[in-house]
């Protein structure tokens, strides 16, 4: 019987882990400190940058505690924290039983599609392999509890934002940013900084849980009443790009090797729209608030936790283009200085230095005792 690609990769992972385990048994390999390993994929995107942010802040207060790696096969006798439940699913059968494993579960429910339904079933059936589960939002925390994840095994640790890096621009910084990205001076610049296409290619097939169709529809409606320019970042944005082109909405798409360079894009914005149907965060909610950018977000992920509707930003029901547009029109027409001032105060409570200590205190400390 032929072995499929997924099965072959699984066998390779088993072989890698078994090899390191055998070397450890023979006394030829002991692994390396520190005691906690935060595992990410190699892709230069959100999960990797989340890991760097958590780990950097923890190491600043608790040196020698945790490191970032994309090589779980070499981990023996460690606390192993997978930053994505999907990545853990690929390695769960192969990992050394000497490890204590934690998984961050950001988002996903069976209704999101057959593949996600299979993933959820596998995750719940293999809880015995885990020492803990982390999630970022109250929404997903409630969901996991409803599915039977034990309260004692679950911790809610919000995503964070570097409030010293993401700050409101002064007038000169704003002018420089808009000139750099080709934003005309007389337009209203709307931002969308995410990955919303399937895979890592052009992204012409939409990842619908990220709401790219909702974003395009909302922007097209706003463009009837305002001179709109869209600034996009992130990989796999082809679906959104084609949609904007079809509606004649001008845009610029940029991608950064260093994610932190995205701060200059926030400096160019008049509005940020987060139109997802399902989210774990996203970080853009806090980054917008920290950067003084007015925000309209759908009621999903951490947006429900950090947005006080009509106070520091606006919330809209998932899939409700009409409400998204109405809230955006209000911010663009009436001004948003009070919103952005309150949003900045909100973001400061989620600085990485604060949320990383939650991760250390509620998850790592007990496992390291």
Predicted regions and their residues:
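Carbohydrate-associated surface elements
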Residues: 139, 160
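Conserved catalytic-core segment of nucleotide-activated headgroup transferases in glycan assembly
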Residues: 179-180, 185-239
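Nucleotide-activated donor-binding/catalytic signature segment of Leloir-type glycosyltransferases, i.e.
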Residues: 234, 238-260
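Short alpha-helical donor nucleotide-sugar binding micro-motif in glycosyltransferases
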Residues: 264-269
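Aromatic "clamp/platform" in nucleotide-sugar-dependent glycosyltransferases that forms part
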Residues: 277
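Short hydrophobic beta-strand element within catalytic cores of glycosyltransferases
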Residues: 294-297, 307
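Conserved acidic donor-binding segment of nucleotide-sugar-dependent glycosyltransferases
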Residues: 309-310, 314-320, 330-335
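A charged, aromatic-enriched C-terminal amphipathic alpha-helix characteristic of glycosyltransferases
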Residues: 337-365
């Amino acid at each position: 019987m032929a072995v499929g690609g997924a099965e072959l990769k699984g066998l390779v992972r088993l072989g890698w882990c078994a090899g390191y385990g055998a070397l450890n048994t023979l006394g030829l390999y002991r692994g390396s400190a520190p005691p906690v390993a935060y595992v990410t994929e190699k892709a230069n995107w959100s999960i990797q940058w989340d890991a760097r942010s958590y780990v950097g802040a923890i190491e600043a207060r608790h040196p020698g505690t945790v490191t970032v790696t994309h090589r779980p096969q070499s981990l023996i006798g460690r606390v192993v924290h997978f930053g994505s439940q999907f990545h853990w699913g690929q390695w769960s059968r192969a990992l050394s039983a000497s490890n204590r494993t934690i998984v961050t579960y950001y988002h996903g429910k069976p209704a999101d599609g057959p593949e996600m339904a299979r993933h959820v079933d596998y995750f719940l059936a293999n809880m015995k392999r885990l020492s803990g589960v982390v999630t970022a939002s109250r929404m997903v925390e409630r969901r996991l509890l409803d599915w039977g994840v034990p309260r004692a095994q679950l911790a809610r640790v919000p995503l964070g934002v570097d409030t010293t890096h993401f700050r409101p621009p002064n007038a000169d910084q704003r002018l420089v940013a808009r000139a750099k990205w080709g934003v005309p001076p007389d337009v209203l610049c709307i931002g969308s900084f995410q990955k919303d296409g399937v895979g890592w290619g052009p992204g012409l097939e939409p990842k619908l849980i990220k709401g790219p169709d909702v974003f395009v529809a909302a922007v097209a409606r706003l463009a009837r009443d305002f001179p709109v320019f869209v600034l996009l970042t992130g990989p796999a944005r082809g679906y959104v790009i084609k949609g904007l082109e079809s509606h004649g909405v001008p845009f610029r798409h940029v991608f950064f090797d260093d994610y932190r360079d995205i701060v200059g894009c926030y400096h160019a914005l008049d509005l940020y729209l987060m139109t997802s149907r399902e989210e774990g965060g996203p970080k853009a909610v806090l980054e917008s608030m920290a950067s003084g950018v007015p925000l309209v977000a759908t009621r999903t992920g951490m947006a429900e936790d950090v947005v006080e509707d009509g106070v520091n930003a606006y919330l809209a029901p998932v899939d409700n283009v009409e409400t998204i547009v109405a809230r955006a029109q209000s911010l663009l027409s009436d001004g948003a200085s009070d919103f952005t001032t309150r949003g900045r105060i909100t973001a400061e409570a989620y600085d990485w230095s604060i949320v990383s200590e939650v991760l250390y205190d509620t998850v790592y400390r007990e496992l390291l005792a």
